[in-house]
A protein has these predicted regions:
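Active-site-adjacent C-terminal substructures of enzyme catalytic domains
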Residues: 116-207
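Divalent metal-dependent hydrolysis catalytic cores, especially in the metallo-beta-lactamase
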Residues: 1-20, 36-49, 76-87, 103-106, ...
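Surface-exposed amphipathic alpha-helices with a cationic face
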Residues: 26-29, 95-102, 179
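Short helix-capping segments at alpha-helix termini
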Residues: 30-36, 75, 100-101, 182-183
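Active-site glycine- and acidic-residue-rich loops that bind
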Residues: 14-20, 87-89, 102-114, 164-181, ...
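Charged helix-capping and loop-helix junction motifs
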Residues: 21-24, 65-67, 142-149
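Conserved phosphate-binding/catalytic loop of the ribokinase/pfkB sugar-kinase fold
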Residues: 49-74
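Extended, charged catalytic domains and RNA/DNA-binding interfaces, predominantly
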Residues: 71, 79-139
Length: 207
């Protein structure tokens, strides 16, 4: 399908399942001879907004706690990106910690407003995962309108974005809009494919 690099991505789950993922990733990377290059792990959650959980299991959503995420970082050196809702209590401190570990803090599954994204950007959140998917746009509270994550992604010039470029998650006009206003140098394309991709019709497991 033309995918040149693969970043296996987790879903919200128990910490025990996460540790299993770390072990499986290392084994799969050793066995991967002819496929897309494995370039690291992407942790998607569990620090997400319940209002924007999307396909994530809401039962496992939580706020960042230093003791927990430091243990996770200690358990795997393969993590290259961690997607978080930056408005959550403790998220900015997590972003700074990730930077110290040379891990990209990214914004996802979030109900943040523009001002919160600005603060997050200074704390290291310089990337948006799956732009437009499960994140805030313009909202209205008490008769006032607030710009959201989508608007912040465009207005913060050095913010990079990732879009699911399968032609289904985003229609062609939005893909063109992202390309026009963020440009090729600040836009990453991903498949967001799960294990059923390329398989015959039938049941498959997500995660």
């Amino acid at each position: 399908y033309g995918t040149t690099a693969m970043v296996p991505t987790t879903l919200t789950s128990t910490n025990e399942e996460l540790m299993t993922t770390f072990t499986v990733y290392r084994k799969a990377k050793e066995m991967n001879i002819n496929g897309s290059q494995f370039i690291g792990l992407h942790l998607e959650g569990p620090y997400f907004s319940p209002k924007q959980c999307g396909a994530q299991d809401p039962n496992f959503l939580k706020k960042p706690q230093a003791e927990e995420y430091n243990a996770i970082l200690e358990a795997s050196k393969d993590i290259i990106r961690w997607s978080v809702a930056p408005e959550l209590e403790g998220a900015l401190a997590l972003g700074q910690t990730l930077q110290q570990h040379h891990i990209l803090p990214s914004i996802a599954h979030t109900d943040a407003i523009y001002e919160e994204v600005e603060k997050a950007f200074t704390a290291g959140y310089t990337h948006v995962t799956h732009l437009y998917s499960a994140m805030s746009s313009v909202t209205r509270k008490n008769a006032f309108r607030y710009a959201g994550v989508v608007e912040a992604a465009y207005l913060i010039e050095d913010m990079t974005v990732e879009i699911i470029a399968d032609g289904i998650h985003l229609p062609k006009p939005l893909l063109q809009f992202v390309y026009k206003f963020k440009g090729v140098d600040k836009t990453a394309l991903c498949t967001d494919a799960m294990r059923g991709a390329g398989m015959p019709d039938g049941e498959s497991i997500l995660g």
